[in-house]
Amino acid sequence: MADQLTDEQIAEFKEAFSLFDKDGDGCITTKELGTVMRSLGQNPTEAELQDMINEVDADGNGTIDFPEFLNLMAKKMKDTDSEEELKEAFRVFDKDQNGFISAAELRHVMTNLGEKLTDEEVDEMIREADVDGDGQINYEEFVKVMMAK
């Protein structure tokens, strides 16, 4: 599960994890888990936290190490990709609402997100997602890419 995270996500999670690993022993207590997840934009309920902790804390010692934490976050992030959120995200990229994301639309959104990409990088992103080879991304291709991350 954690192998589907990007290096950037892993670095971000490591940073957050370290903030709460007060004594630097590589473990955080179950109490701290909620705080860590909230700092990363997740909003788990108490019941969800308890379930996650029970799932992850195999030996029941009340602490979670970094590999366990990564698996937890990867699972949590996958769960948040609901159909409705994917449709909304696709609409954001598909500026002219023609049902396709073009290289220009992709570049526009990425620039607005603060990502300065070269034409080559944008073309590469399109190529990776463009299953039918028409030079743009349709909704099915978009969903495939989003679910694979």
UniProtKB/Swiss-Prot annotation:
Any single Pfam family the record assigns to this protein: EF-hand_7
Keywords: Acetylation, Calcium, Metal-binding, Methylation, Repeat
Keyword Translocase (UniProt): no
GO MF term (any one): enzyme regulator activity
Signal peptide bounds: none
Binding site for Ca(2+) 2: D57, D59, N61, T63, E68
Domain named EF-hand: residues: 8-43, 44-79, 81-116, 117-149
Gene Ontology cellular component annotations, sorted alphabetically: cytoplasm
Residues noted as binding Ca(2+) 1 in the record, renumbered to the chain: D21, D23, D25, C27, E32
Record PTM N-acetylalanine, positions in chain: A2
Binding site for Ca(2+) 3: D94, D96, N98, E105
Binding of Ca(2+) 4, residues: D130, D132, D134, Q136, E141
Coiled-coil annotated spans: none
Domain of life: Eukaryota
Keyword Calcium: yes
Chain positions found as N6,N6,N6-trimethyllysine: K116
Cross-referenced PANTHER family: CALMODULIN, MYOSIN LIGHT CHAIN 1, 3
Miscellaneous remark of the record: This protein has four functional calcium-binding sites.
Record-stated family: Belongs to the calmodulin family.
General function of this protein: Calmodulin mediates the control of a large number of enzymes, ion channels and other proteins by Ca(2+). Among the enzymes to be stimulated by the calmodulin-Ca(2+) complex are a number of protein kinases and phosphatases.
Protein name, as recorded: Calmodulin-2
Originating species: Oryza sativa subsp. japonica
